[in-house]
C-alpha cells in the first residue's frame, strides 16, 4: 500500500508539473507553429513559417550540413569550434540573397589587388633574397629545378616598374617566350583516380608537372619527385570552366587545377614568382608551353639550361584557363609551336597580316591586331588563321602539316571539352569558308563544323545578342563583344545556307531578330571596319567615334550584308520549293514550279536592283550563283519541258558571266585563296553548262560558247602550281577530275547522258545539289558499262524500248537540230596535267561575253619536251611532239577535239605516213589562231631549215615571258613577244586577233573537225585551210546538214577538205574505245546512236607498215592517259562523293 501511495504521489507530482509546463510549451508551439490566420496575417515575416524547431546553428544551416549545437549547448557545435566561428541558434536568421556571391566577388578583387601588388614589387623580393645566404641558395636551387605548374600566366614585362636591380630590368627586356600547344595522343575522358583527398591531388599535381620537364632536369633531381607511370597522360583539364564552386565539389581534374592555381601560384615556385625570370647578368630566356593535353615527354624539344650562352629556353608548362595566357600583346613571344610545326613571331605576324588583308574581307566575322593578341584570345583561332594564310604560300608544306594538326586540335577543343568562347565558333567558321583538304565530298568536315559552331553558339547565347548574361557567366571576354558576337552568329547563318546549297540539303537556320536588324540597317563605313581589323591604336578612337544609338552595332560591311541578303533569299527559296509535305521528295509539285519560280526570280531581280550587287565582283558572283539555283530548280525531274525552255538561256548567260567574273578575279588573286562560295559558283556553272550542251533545248548559237566556258573552268582549276596540284586535294581538284571523267563518258558511253529525258533526270531529292549527284551517277554508270559489256547491251536495249514508247516530242521529234538521240556528242579538250609550271593560260573574253582560254607552254616545258624527244626518238634536231603527253596541236583547242589539227601543222604531206613529229624546234614557232598575241611574220628559207630556228632558250623573257597564273586581254600589247610557242609551223599573218563566236554573226555552222576523219593524208593542207579549221571550231554543228545515211562504212570517201560544207561523215564513237590489246572482244562491237549504226573494226586496221597509229588511236591513248583508273579497273578514282561502299547494281 505504501508503495502504491508513493507511486500515486509521484504521478500526481508529475501531472501537476506537466500541467505547469504545458502553457509554456503551448506558447512555444504557438510561437514556432502559428495558426493559419497568424500565417496569413504575418506572411511577410518569413521566420514565422518554420515547420519544425531550429536545432542547427546559422553557419551549419547555410551549408546544409549536420550540426550538434543542441547537444553541446551552451558550448558551440563541433564545426564552429574547429573553424573558430561564432555559433548561434537563431530561428529568425535569414541570409540576404546574393550576399555570398558578392562576398566571393570581393574576395576575388582583393586577391587580384594583392597579386598585382606582389607582381609590381617582384624585384624587391629578389633583392631581399639575394641579401641573405639562405636566399641565394634557395634561388639557385629553384633556378636549377623549376617546378612547372598549370595555370601559368606570364606577366607583362612592360607593366613592371623600373625600380629594382638593373639586371632584372634587362632580363625583362631580353627575355623571349616560346608558346606551344600540345595535342593528346588519345583522348582521356575518364580519370584514373577519383578520390577527394586533397593530398592525393597534390601528389598527382606534382607528378604530372614533373612529367613535362626536360630530360636534363629529371636527371639532376629525380629522387624528390613523386613516382609516376612513364606513359601516363596528364589528366584532362577543362580550359574554359571557371572554378566558381567550392573545391570539394569540383571534379578531380578541376580540383587539381584549382589547387595549382590557388596554392602553387603564390609560392616562390609559382607562376608569378620573379624566379622564373633571370637573376644573373646572363639572361636565360623563358619558355611558356601552353598545353591542352600533354603527352609524356612532349616538351623534349628546346632543351634549356641555366646561364647558357646560347640563350635556350626553360620550360614553364601552362594550361589554358579563363584568364588570358598572355595578358599583354607586347609580351616578348618569339615562337609558336604546334606538334612539329614551329612559327617564329615574324612569320606569324606576316601570316596574320596576309589573313587580315587578303582573306578576312571575304568573311568579316572577327578582328585581330597582331598574332600574339590572337594567340592569347584563342589557340584554335590563332592556328586556324595561320593555316588559312598559308594558302598564299608557293609551297604547301606547312599547310599540309598544319591541316591535320588543326583538325585534331578542333576535335579536342570542341568535342572533348566544352568551349566557352566565341572565338571557337569563329575558328570553325573560317575552316568552313576555306575548307581543309579533302578528297571526297563526305570527307569534308565543313558542314559538320558549321553544325558544331551553331550548337556552341546556341549554348553561348549568340542568337540573343545583348542577353549574354542569361546564358553563362564564364565566357571569354572580348572588346565590343555584342557586335562581334552578332557578326559571328550571322556568319553561321550564311555558312550554313552556303553549305546546305553545296550538298543539296535543306537548311535549318531561320530568319531571326538579329538577321532582320542587320539587313535593315545601313552599311558600316569601310574605314571603321579596317580599323577593327588592322590598327590597334586606332581601335580605341573608333570606339569613341561609334554612333551613340544602338543600331550601330548591327551595321555590317556592305559586301557581307549583301551576302546575307542573298543567303536569306536562299533560305526562302529552299523552303518554298524543297519543303513540300505532299510529295515524298519534298519538292513542289511540277505544275506549280514555273509560276512560283517566276515570282521568286522577279523578287531576286528586285533585290539585286535595290542592293546593287554588281558593284562588287564577289557579291555579283554569288548573286549569279543564286540565280543559277533558281534555274536549276526548273530543271529537276518531271518539270514540263515547256517550262524549262525560258530558264535554259538564262542559265547559260548566267553561268558564262560567272566564268568571266572569275577570270577577272584571278588577275589579282589565286584560285585557292578564294572562299568556298566563289569556287562553288564557278563549279556549279561548269556543271550546268556541261549539262546544257547535252540538251536540244539550248539554242545552237550558244553551243560552242558553253563548251568553251567549261574548258576555261577546267583549265583555270588545273593550272595551279605543281606542288599544290600534287599535294593538296580539295574541291578544286575534285571538280577538275570530275569534268575529266565526264569527258571520258562522252568518249566511251555518251548514250548515258541522253537515255533519259530532261536536263536532270536521275536525281531529285538533293534540291539543286541533284545536278552534281546526277553527273556522279553518270560516271559510275559509264564505268559499270565499260567493265560489263553484257550489262551495257541490256542497258542500250532498255533505253531504246523506253525511247520508242516515250511521248515527249521535244526530245524525240525531228527539228532543225534533230532528235536528242541523233545528236553527236564530242569530247572536250580537257587535260589533267597542265600545271602552271609547264603551261600558261592565256584568256580572252569575246564581245559576246565568252571567256576563251589558250594554253601556252612555258620555257621549262619546251626544254624538257625537247630533251624527252631526243631521248625517245633519237632525233638530233630535237623534234617535239607533245608536252606532258598533250599533243601540241591540241593545245589550241577550246571546243571539240579535232583530228585534222593533229597533222595540219606539218608542211610535208607524208608526215603521217613517215611518222614525223608534230613540232620541230628547227621550224618557226607561231601562235594559235585564237591567241591574243600580236602576229609577226618571220621569213623562212626553204633551202636551210636551220636558218629560221628560234632560240627560245637563250632569248629568255623576250620570247617566252614569265607569266603568272593567267593573262587577260587587259595586258598591254607591247609586253608580249613577237613569236611564241604555238601549234603551226608557219606564222599566221592574215588572222585577226578578234575572233568572235557565231552568236554575234549567225551563219550556217560547219561540221566539227571531229566528224571529218580524213583517211587520205596525201593531200597537203594550206595555211588558209588550217586557219579556216581553227575558226570553224567555234561554230561547228551538232547535227548533220546533209541527209543522214543508215550505213556509214565507206569512210574513205570523206572529202579531204575539212572546211567544206559537204563533209557529212561522222566518226563512230567506237573510235575512242580501247585498242585490241586491251579489250579484244570489243573490236566488232556495234554502237547504236539514233539511226546511225557503225562498227569499230573499220578503224582499227589502218596502221601502216611502220605500225603508225591512226589519229583515232592516238586520241584513244591520249584520253586513256588522261583518265587513268578507267582502263586499269580502279574505280576509286570515280568516287567523288564517297559511294564506294554503296550498292551499284542495276537497281541503284
UniProtKB/Swiss-Prot annotation:
Q: Name one GO cellular component term.
A: nucleus
* Lineage: superkingdom: Eukaryota
Its annotated compartments are:
Nucleus
List the biased-composition ranges (Low complexity): 150-169
| Biological process terms in GO annotation | DNA-templated transcription; regulation of DNA-templated transcription; sporulation resulting in formation of a cellular spore
Record field: compositional bias (Basic and acidic residues): 538-550
**Alphabetical keyword list:** DNA-binding, Metal-binding, Nucleus, Phosphoprotein, Sporulation, Transcription, Transcription regulation, Zinc
UniProt-listed InterPro entries: prtT, Transcription_factor_dom_fun, Zn2-C6_fun-type_DNA-bd_sf, Zn2Cys6_DnaBD
Q: What is its main location?
A: nucleus
Does the keyword section mention Nuclease? Answer: no
What name does this protein carry?
A: Putative transcription factor SEF1
Q: What is the lineage of its organism?
A: Eukaryota, Fungi, Dikarya, Ascomycota, Saccharomycotina
